[in-house]
A protein has these predicted regions:
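Short His-centered aromatic/hydrophobic patch
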Residues: 82-88, 106
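A charged, aromatic-enriched C-terminal amphipathic alpha-helix characteristic of glycosyltransferases
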Residues: 14, 165, 310-363
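Conserved donor-binding/catalytic core segment of Leloir-type glycosyltransferases
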Residues: 4, 170-200, 211-212
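Nucleotide-activated donor-binding/catalytic signature segment of Leloir-type glycosyltransferases, i.e.
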Residues: 223-248
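Acidic anion/phosphate-binding donor-loop and adjacent secondary structure
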Residues: 139, 146, 154-170, 186-190
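A short, active-site helix/loop in glycosyltransferases that binds the activated sugar's phosphate group
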Residues: 123-148, 155-159
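C-terminal active-site subregion of NodB/CE4 polysaccharide deacetylases
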Residues: 370-442, 448-449, 518-620
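N-terminal strand-loop element at the rim of the active site
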Residues: 5-62, 215-226
Length: 620
């Protein structure tokens, strides 16, 4: 895929660091990446183009739109990823009526406007760096959260993987080194001012506390008059509080380890915690206090103090700051707890997983931009010669199945498999050749009558289907439900499974022995089931297994992430999921097909409006 990162930088910010980090990983993955911005203040390996993205001139904005439209056409750009309000607005107009998708990352509060309420300028999907940003967008703009993903800033944890606890132990706040890292502009300027003023008011509590300003200066924070007064105050208290200024272009674990505690938010808070340094979360909106192993998720929701839907400026209570400093002092004597926090942060913010999620979101956005309708995904099980006893009605007789195929043919449907969808989604096949009326036929379990009855009929009518097969090749029948409410039904087993290779079916995974995802003791066991079944089937059939079907349609919170982590590209449910296929490709809605389907029921279940109708009726 060809990607453009669109920024409006006039100085270095976290958004540019974030964009260059994404670009570097995407280049490693073989993507072609461009970076467009007013200026460049962080090294980038993407192809850079200067463009006045941030402009107050309407004429310049219109010129930018036409220039960018020409650029995406000339370079065959699949996705524009915007990283600022100005970039999102430009990206929106530049991609109108094109095949290029648009995704925006929102790092903080968005100012309300009538135009944003009337139509979504942020693209097919919005990435928010924390839950509070997502809440503000949904509340103030009325956006549907189905197209918003909370994905944290990726961090190269390898820079911080040499965790070593501080050897020196402090017994009080004497000789304590505290750092405030980050720029001193906007609300963060006020944050820094509040901390310094609080420490001055409480200087009698210290003997030798050293405050390091990293990336900012006192002159950035205070007026000339207040700066003179401040320096006089510092001279009067002598060694109780010392303030130093330092410029570090790129912070690493070795920097953080020289400080006893760090005050920061966003990326700074994450990096400090990863380094094993006591971290006090204080950002543009909130003083969250000391980061502990119990409040990581809570603090992540505000991006460690940077965002609250209803708070616009930071405030600080002296006692809260002193309590956090004392907690940091105690933490210095508990390096094991710092290590636990570092490991938890590593799990959440590790860059590899986040880069993979964003890349997959690009693909979903590209697919949604080019085909935004619901694609019917029908679910079959058994295709017996004649009627059978089945309490769950999970069969269609061979004669009726042929009627279904005749109906699909007469309605002009073209069947697709998930591997074919993948080729369109990743830009390997142009959407110019995408079928006008796509249809996905799926079969579960691997019954013999699928091979004997369904496959020949599918071939006869020029159709193909997806078979979700159990990885245990020794299973000979439906042991999970036979004897109670379903008759025993033969499953293709042993060496006969090789016959699937020449059938009308593409293989997907249905687990190993038909256990529901909720049957496993913990997440690791469930993940192993998905990975192991995938590996077995790939070894057996000799091609990548791209899709997974949750047994019984049973899922649990995080099931979609499990399928993603296991390496699948799609996962299907039974009667719940996204309103479109790529809204959540790991929770795909399937339509149950029953023995008594007729022309009108099939017409309803394959109509483009059916999924939304089902959702409004069943609320799932």
């Amino acid at each position: 895929m060809n990607i453009v990162h669109l920024l409006s930088q006039n100085h270095l910010t976290g958004a540019e660091v974030y964009a260059t980090s994404l670009a570097e990983k995407q280049l490693q993955d073989g993507l072609k990446v461009y970076q467009l911005s007013n200026g460049f203040f962080a090294p980038t390996k993407a192809v850079p183009f200067k463009l006045e993205v941030e402009t107050k001139s309407k004429i310049q904005f219109i010129k930018n739109v036409f220039w960018l439209r020409n650029f995406i056409s000339k370079e065959s750009i699949h996705v524009i990823h915007s990283h600022s309000r100005a970039a999102s607005k430009l990206g929106f107009y530049a991609t109108l009526f094109t095949r290029t998708a648009h995704v925006s990352t929102v790092h903080g509060r968005q100012h309300p406007s009538i135009s944003k309420k009337l139509f979504n300028q942020y693209g097919q999907f919005i990435i928010t760096v924390c839950e509070n940003v997502k809440k503000q967008i949904c509340r103030d703009f009325g956006y549907d959260d189905r197209n918003i993903r909370t994905i944290p800033n990726p961090i190269d944890v390898e820079i911080f993987n040499d965790y070593k606890p501080h050897l020196e132990r402090k017994t009080d706040l004497n000789d304590f080194v505290l750092a405030i890292a980050g720029r001193a502009t906007g609300p963060k300027k006020e944050r820094t001012r509040l901390v310094i003023e609080s420490l001055l008011r409480n200087s009698s509590r210290f003997k030798n506390l050293k405050l390091i300003l990293v990336g900012s200066k006192l002159s950035d924070v205070f007026s000339d008059q207040r700066l003179i007064e401040l320096k006089l105050s510092l001279n009067q208290i002598q060694t109780a509080l010392q303030i130093q200024e330092t410029e570090i272009s790129e912070l690493t674990g070795s920097h953080y380890k020289t400080w006893d505690a760090v005050i920061g938010s966003g990326r700074v808070a994450m990096e400090a915690a990863l380094s094993g340094t006591a971290t006090i979360a204080f950002g543009e909106a909130l003083f969250e206090g000391l980061l502990t192993q119990d409040n990581v998720d809570q603090l992540f929701s505000s991006n460690f103090g940077d965002m609250h839907p209803d708070i616009f400026e930071p405030a600080l209570n002296d006692e809260h700051l002193l309590k956090a400093l004392e907690g940091a002092l105690l933490r210095k004597n508990k390096p094991a707890e710092n290590k636990i926090i570092a490991e938890k942060m590593r799990e959440i913010f590790g860059s590899q997983q986040i880069h993979s999620r964003i890349k997959r979101l690009y693909e979903s956005a590209y697919f949604q931009k080019n085909y935004s309708c619901w694609i019917p995904v029908l679910m079959y099980h058994k295709i017996p010669d004649q009627e059978i006893q089945s309490q769950h009605k999970i069969y269609v007789t061979k004669p009726n199945f042929e009627k279904h195929l005749k109906f699909f043919k007469s309605r002009g449907f073209t069947t697709l498999t998930f591997s074919e969808l993948s080729l369109f989604r990743t830009g390997k096949i142009s959407f110019n050749s995408f079928p006008k009326k796509p249809l996905i036929l799926t079969f579960d379990d691997g019954y013999k009558d699928n091979l004997v009855n369904a496959s020949p009929l599918l071939k006869q009518y020029g159709f193909k289907a997806q078979l979700f097969l159990l990885a245990d090749s020794q299973l000979q029948s439906n042991t999970w439900d036979s004897g109670e409410d379903e008759p025993t039904h033969e499953i293709v087993s042993g060496d006969d499974r090789a016959l699937w290779k020449s059938s009308a079916f593409e293989i997907g995974s249905h687990g190993i022995r038909h256990l529901p995802i909720t049957a496993f003791a913990n997440r690791d066991h469930a993940l192993n089931e998905l990975i192991e079944s995938k590996n077995r089937l790939e070894k057996e059939f000799g091609y990548p297994i791209k899709s997974f079907a949750f047994t019984y349609g049973i899922t649990s919170p995080g099931s979609d992430q499990l399928a993603f982590d296991a390496g699948y590209e799609y996962a299907v449910n039974t009667d719940s999921g996204g309103l479109t296929l790529e809204e959540n490709p790991y929770s795909i809605f399937r339509v149950n097909i029953f023995p008594d389907e007729n022309y009108w029921s099939l017409l309803k279940k394959t109509s483009s409006w059916y999924r939304r109708y089902f959702y409004l009726k069943r609320k799932k």
